[in-house]
């Protein structure tokens, strides 16, 4: 394995759609995901890829903001690593790389949301020092 972590340029954001589709709601189509990602890259958003040589095997979005309770923070979004690359320490290396990257940009905290049913991810994040602070609620208004 030749693992590298790289920022995915905005003009190449379409490469993440197949990976994110694997973890998203089945009713969200690939064309809709692509449309949303093309809009996201125009906001305070970056996307980091995990590459094995030239093959994209993992991804995480980063939303940059300032919050009253955590200061300058980055929210991890749609964190995903292909099944064949899991349970090999790659997730910890990825989060550590992200932490160093965002700290170098002057950010103070990392936050994320995890689906309630995704217990393995909860255990992973807790082992990595994340603390549960609350629930994330969504209400569609469209």
Question: Which role does the model predict for each range below?
Answer:
Residues 95, 102-114:
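Conserved GNAT acetyl-CoA-binding A-motif
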Residues 65-76, 86, 132-133:
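A conserved beta-turn-beta hairpin within the catalytic core of GNAT-like acetyltransferases
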Residues 1-11:
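Conserved N-terminal entry element of GNAT/NAT acetyltransferase domains
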Residues 49, 55-64, 80:
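Conserved beta-strand in the GNAT
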Residues 3, 54-59, 74:
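Glycine-rich phosphate/pyrophosphate-binding loop shared by adenosine-nucleotide-utilizing enzymes
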Residues 39-49, 75:
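A short helix-loop-beta-strand connector motif used in the catalytic cores of GNAT acetyltransferases and
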């Amino acid at each position: 394995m030749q693992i590298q972590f790289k920022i995915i340029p905005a003009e190449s954001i379409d490469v993440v759609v197949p990976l994110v589709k694997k973890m998203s709601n089945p009713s969200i189509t690939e064309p809709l995901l692509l449309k949303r990602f093309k809009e996201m890259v125009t906001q305070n958003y970056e996307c980091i890829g995990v590459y094995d040589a030239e093959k994209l095997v993992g991804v995480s979005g980063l939303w940059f903001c300032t919050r009253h309770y955590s200061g300058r923070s980055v929210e991890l979004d749609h964190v995903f690593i292909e099944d064949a690359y899991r349970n090999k320490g790659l997730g910890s290396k990825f989060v550590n790389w992200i932490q160093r990257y965002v700290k170098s940009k002057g950010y103070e905290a990392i936050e994320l949301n995890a689906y309630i049913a995704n217990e393995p991810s909860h255990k992973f994040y807790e082992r990595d020092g994340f603390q549960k602070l609350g629930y994330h609620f969504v209400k569609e208004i469209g």
